[in-house]
Amino acid sequence: MLRRDLLAGGLAVVATSPAWASPSEWTPAQFHAARRFVDLDVGRIAYVERGSGPAAIFLHGYPLNGFQWRGAMVRLEGHRRCIAVDLMGLGYSDVAADADLSPAAQAAMVVAVMDKLGLEAADLVSNDSATGVAQLVAAGHPKRVRSLLLTNGDVDTNSPPPPFMGAIEAARNDQLVGWFDRQLADNAFVRSHDGIGRGYSHPDQMLTPAVVDTYLRPLTGPDKRRRQGQGYAIAMLPNPLPAAAPALRAFDKPVRMVWARNNELFGDEWAAWLDKTFPRSRGVRFVEDANLFFPEERPDLIAEEARKLWGV
């Protein structure tokens, strides 16, 4: 039931081996210690940052948070001010109980955070549902985006993908939060294909109890947060992306796709759609033996692609 049954991927095929951790990657405790907040009208938006220079904003998948990008950030901090934002309803952002959690509202939040941090423009790096959010930022605020590095995620009419509709229905029936609860209590379940482990190629290595707690504990806390963890999924409908297609065709900045091949939610054809749609596409790199959350498992690959895209 996660962004559902997360398979694997790759076109300019690559077979890099997973990188679990380097000594300088944040541990969960260090991630928590690094957290900062931006105060917006909608509430407090959590973020972490490291490095200096032009800004790069990293947008995470569902139901994760900015911790997903710890590996890429440490590898890129010498080239960018790397900022990972927790989307509204997820992670450690604290927004009003009735806050709009839709992709369009998330995109507006990203721009508002940029305003608060004094960022005229940023490179965007995204995964899963946030790939749709990144496209909306580019469509609505093209001057604020220097480049897009997009990994498997929502595209055009495949938002939300049909296999995810069952999770949305469970959220509407107040049942998805039980799935989060069980994963916090059962290490085997969370690492299985019935838990978020389905989004990883190597869940036993990636999903330690501390990592699982970092991702899912916020979604099982007070009633407001329990509802928002589900509300994020519900708010994926209606789909805003088809209406953004004309603006994407006019987006004149560099765009690169790095795509897990044959992913069950976000197949190869959607990377091809992006490649054809963006006039300055730098093409697609398909990744073999990868799953939905491969950016967390393969930070070296993400960092390599980001450096090429940014010309550093």
PLM features: residue spans?
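Conserved short acidic donor-positioning loop in nucleotide-sugar-dependent glycosyltransferases
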Residues: 290
